[in-house]
Amino acid sequence: DIARFEARAVRLFRRVMPFVRLTSSMARRTSIDDRFFFKGAPAVIVVIARGDIDGALAASNMELMAQAHGLGVLYSGFFTMAARLSRGLRRELGLGRKQKVVTALVLGYPAVRYRRTAPKEAAAISWK
């Protein structure tokens, strides 16, 4: 099913990209290959909800749990956009009339292992 969903989304993006490239320099630098949305990952969680807040909170907890188990997580915002644009993709995902794709979490074991986090400046926090 993952491959079928991705293939449908790729077809949609390939159809609309010529128009998007007219106004977006980022789109002009982007090529849409067959693995554009899910990057060949072994698992994808498509978060479906009636409202954005509930779905986003659920996705955030899923991300934390996946990372706690050593998985890497990528939010595929482009797949979310494709699902919102394509009635056929929504139908294929089995969405009800009041449901929508809030996000898609692409899961897999990271190909790299970081030795440390990126350096960050201390946050300026004031309590009142």
Residue ranges and their predicted role:
Residues D33, R84, R90, K120-A122:
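Residue-level signal for pocket-adjacent positions within structured domains
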Residues F36-G40, L93-K98, A118-P119:
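Solvent-exposed alpha-helices and their adjacent loops that cap or buttress functional pockets
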